[in-house]
Amino acid sequence: MPLQVSDYSWQQTKTAVFLSLPLKGVCVRDTDVFCTENYLKVNFPPFLFEAFLYAPIDDESSKAKIGNDTIVFTLYKKEAAMWETLSVTGVDKEMMQRIREKSILQAQERAKEATEAKAAAKREDQKYALSVMMKIEEEERKKIEDMKENERIKATKELEAWKEYQRKAEEQKKIQREEKLCQKEKQIKEERKKIKYKSLTRNLASRNLAPKGRNSENIFTEKLKEDSIPAPRSVGSIKINFTPRVFPTALRESQVAEEEEWLHKQAEARRAMNTDIAELCDLKEEEKNPEWLKDKGNKLFATENYLAAINAYNLAIRLNNKMPLLYLNRAACHLKLKNLHKAIEDSSKALELLMPPVTDNANARMKAHVRRGTAFCQLELYVEGLQDYEAALKIDPSNKIVQIDAEKIRNVIQGTELKS
């Protein structure tokens, strides 16, 4: 049972109470202070001090100071008045117990409110930090978008300047062709004049030298007419023998039928042009060429202007949808822009057009499998991605980069199976 402490001293003013309590040699670490508006308890085993205060105090602003083996309390009164005693008198045990329980409940409520207030303040801080981070990210995103827009404007200006240069060059060539044509027409006219003049001179000479007979005059006239008309050109034929294309494949591994089919498909793809597009009337001749558009898209891809590159490939595909490299290159752009489903579609379309599989299209088929596999892996479809990588390795087993990536995908799949 703890020993009650009674050797304390206290003083007061109308607004505060000053209480001095000796610790009796007890370590400060072992001292526990509990204070509410009507109750003060100091527990420093084996001693105990309790005070059922005469009037309510402001326990939040009140304070305690420990020093020189003594605790000095400064208790601020809620109402300015002088107390008759420090503790209320005439309190029985039941009343004391009720005051203790009420004080504990008040302390618990206050602690709960403080915890909730702290949690609310923490949430506000987190909300503020999140808003600041979102603002920073938005500014960074806007900065990146501005950079992209500037690059797009720059590329557009360069493209327009290049178009203007091509237009002027084409106009210059047209003027030169017209000048040459005019010169040729002048030369032809002069030649005709000379021939006409020679014919006229020859005709006059024949008339002067010919006999006066009617029949002889007709004979010479007919002869002059025949001489004035040039003889028709002789007809000839030119034989052309084309050199057949031969694939560098060993005879035991030869795929003559497939190779011929591939060559036939390539020739058809080059001839397949869709000119029934409304926008074609505003384009120049070189802009209507899918090969030119493909090269332009490749240059834009190299400058990381992926949206402009996609636009170039789109127009090229509208002009000729049988060229597999257009789909293959557009799939690479979609991968860069994280348009993963579109990358899968374009890679699959490229693989359809790269049939039958021959040595000439092996590299393109390998790239199509790798790009589709990459898109599958970024969609976390690792099994499908591994299948494409293994297909790429069947085409090019010595490709170290594809081998390393395929091994990484296998490790991811095995790790997922172990976790499940």
Swiss-Prot record:
Signal peptide: none annotated. Pfam families: CS. Keywords: Cell projection, Cytoplasm, Neurogenesis, Nucleus, Repeat, TPR repeat. GO terms for biological process: cilium movement; determination of left/right symmetry; epithelial cilium movement involved in extracellular fluid movement; establishment of localization in cell; heart development; inner dynein arm assembly; learning or memory; neuron migration. CDD domains: p23_DYX1C1_like. SUPFAM superfamilies: HSP20-like chaperones, TPR-like. Residues 7-103 are annotated as: Mediates interaction with ESR1 and STUB1. It is found in: Nucleus; Cytoplasm; Cell projection, Neuron projection; Dynein axonemal particle. GO terms for cellular component: cytoplasm; cytosol; dynein axonemal particle; extracellular region; neuron projection; nucleus; plasma membrane. TPR repeats lie at residues 290-323, 324-357, 366-399. InterPro entries: CS_dom, CS_DYX1C1, Dynein_assembly_factor_4, HSP20-like_chaperone, TPR-like_helical_dom_sf, TPR_rpt. One of its GO terms (molecular function) is nuclear estrogen receptor binding. Residues 3-87 form the CS domain. Its main location: nucleus. Involved in neuronal migration during development of the cerebral neocortex. May regulate the stability and proteasomal degradation of the estrogen receptors that play an important role in neuronal differentiation, survival and plasticity. Axonemal dynein assembly factor required for ciliary motility. Interacts with ZMYND10. Interacts with STUB1. Interacts with ESR1 and ESR2. Interacts with DNAAF2. Interacts with CCT3, CCT4, CCT5 and CCT8. Interacts with DNAAF6/PIH1D3. This is Dynein axonemal assembly factor 4. It comes from Pan paniscus. The lineage of its organism: Eukaryota, Metazoa, Chordata, Craniata, Vertebrata.
